[in-house]
């Protein structure tokens, strides 16, 4: 089972990926985690990514696409995976389609979690409070200014993916305002 989770920051993609990973025993592939991993392993691609990130620039699609392609080749992905945070642009979605076709694979579902912006801001604030209360490290981008920028970037770059996948008959849209368990139940229904 190969699934892409779409939605704005704070929509619950990571939460749902965790639930689906446990249910279907397939890995949750987060581009942030994959980038950190190749940098830590000091792979050739990791060295390039580290140099780019160190300069303050965004890692280009060509490198992100390669990291995703390499990760999909790993043994734990043989029965599928859940992508979270990729693709972020139509260009990346087209690249993913080519990557999968070259491996004789296809996506089984693209699921978009829709949540209104006021609720997203409330969720971000609650996540910060819960993290602080638990003595954890707050994400650098979990502050009102950075979060607002992430929402703008999502609207401009990532939201066109809805149309891209809808035109291909692959998009399933879920109201992310309902409870976590109910969202999970609906996703499982789509995947069965």
UniProtKB/Swiss-Prot annotation:
GO terms for biological process: AMP salvage. ATP binds at residues 10-15, 127, 178. It holds the Pfam family ADK. One of its GO terms (cellular component) is cytoplasm. InterPro entries: Adenyl_kin_sub, Adenylat/UMP-CMP_kin, Adenylat_kinase_CS, P-loop_NTPase. Keywords: ATP-binding, Cytoplasm, Kinase, Nucleotide biosynthesis, Nucleotide-binding, Transferase. Its main location: cytoplasm. Its EC number is 2.7.4.3. It catalyses: AMP + ATP = 2 ADP. Residues 30-59 are annotated as: NMP. It is found in: Cytoplasm. Pathway: Purine metabolism; AMP biosynthesis via salvage pathway; AMP from ADP: step 1/1. AMP binds at residues 31, 36, 57-59, 85-88, 92, 139, 150. Residues 126-142 are annotated as: LID. GO terms for molecular function: adenylate kinase activity; ATP binding. PANTHER family: NUCLEOTIDE KINASE (PTHR23359). Belongs to the adenylate kinase family. Catalyzes the reversible transfer of the terminal phosphate group between ATP and AMP. Plays an important role in cellular energy homeostasis and in adenine nucleotide metabolism. Consists of three domains, a large central CORE domain and two small peripheral domains, NMPbind and LID, which undergo movements during catalysis. The LID domain closes over the site of phosphoryl transfer upon ATP binding. Assembling and dissambling the active center during each catalytic cycle provides an effective means to prevent ATP hydrolysis. Monomer. This is Adenylate kinase. The gene is adk.
């Amino acid at each position: 089972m190969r699934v892409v989770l779409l939605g704005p920051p704070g929509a619950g993609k990571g939460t749902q990926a965790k639930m689906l990973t446990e249910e279907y025993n397939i890995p949750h592939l987060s581009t942030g985690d994959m980038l950190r991993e190749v940098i830590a392993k000091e792979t050739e691609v990791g060295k390039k990514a580290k140099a780019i990130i160190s300069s303050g620039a965004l890692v280009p699609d060509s490198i992100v696409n390669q990291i995703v392609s390499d990760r999909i080749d790993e043994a734990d992905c043989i029965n599928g995976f859940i992508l979270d945070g990729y693709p972020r642009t139509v260009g990346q979605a087209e690249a993913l389609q080519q990557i999968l076709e070259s491996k004789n694979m296809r996506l089984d579902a693209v699921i978009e979690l829709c949540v209104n912006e006021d609720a997203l801001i409330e969720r971000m604030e609650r996540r910060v409070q819960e993290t602080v209360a638990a003595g954890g490290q707050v994400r650098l981008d979990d502050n009102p200014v950075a979060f607002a920028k992430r929402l703008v970037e999502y609207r401009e770059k990532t939201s066109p993916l809805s149309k891209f996948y809808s035109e291909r008959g692959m998009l399933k849209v879920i109201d992310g305002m309902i409870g976590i368990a109910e969202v999970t139940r609906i996703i499982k229904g789509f995947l069965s």
